[in-house]
């Protein structure tokens, strides 16, 4: 109950914050017709980590190239928070990870292993809420647990279950919501019986530095992280399926679809089709490791793909 209350209060506070900090083209309230038959700007949010911000830039820039006015609101928050902003009318659309949508928003722990089955379940949930899932990406940025090669060798670790054999506590660097999510500490304890795990709250992106320094023993990561391009880290296998399929699909309000016509879905789907795992890992590396702006990285990708 406490978690639910915190999520609701957080969502309400967020909605007020979004309304207060809207751009010049955004009233912050429910979308209305701007003038005559011209639809109001599409209010797009993103979750609060680099890949999510990059996705927002990709979708928003492609839509703007087609004449859709977009107000991009990056770093809104976790799935629980940003979905509350969507249902509360502060946003019209945002890119979401299907597995997280099912487990943390829809509270569906069935964990379909087939991406198409997961998509159908997520779409059915959103339709009941008055929203629609657009086409999903080829890439799946699944959650995973990473350790250093040295730690893996010292303890003979290959799978998540092997963490149970590590003497003493295993410190996992992860974002704060990891401690209360099924795709996190809750699922790891339920599916693997791991009682020796302790979380160290870290901002997304800082877990690799914590691994390198020895501050943590393991880290919650995303499989398209640019840091995983080399062999500096070992991803532990997840045979019991705590971390589900994480293809991305924009969640959009039906009103926005009506207001902006078929070009909204067609343009977003065209972007999604180009987002392979290789493309995302490369762009993530440019943003996180090379320090480039997500806006510039997205612009280059869209121009190469002839989507801008």
Residues of each region from the PLM?
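Ligand-binding "clamshell"
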Residues: 105-113, 119-134, 213-215, 227-241
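A bilobed periplasmic-binding-protein/Venus flytrap-type ligand-binding module shared by bacterial periplasmic
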Residues: 143-153, 247-260
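An extracytoplasmic/periplasmic, membrane-proximal ligand-sensing/linker region
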Residues: 177-179, 183, 189-194, 263-308
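Bacterial signal peptide processing site
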Residues: 22-25
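Paired acidic/hydrophobic, glycine-rich loop segments that form the ligand-binding mouth/hinge
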Residues: 92-96, 216-222
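C-terminal motif of bacterial Sec signal peptides marking the signal peptidase cleavage site
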Residues: 17-20
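Bilobed "Venus flytrap"/periplasmic-binding protein-like clamshell domains
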Residues: 39-71, 138-209, 213, 292-296
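Bacterial N-terminal signal peptides that target proteins for export
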Residues: 1-10
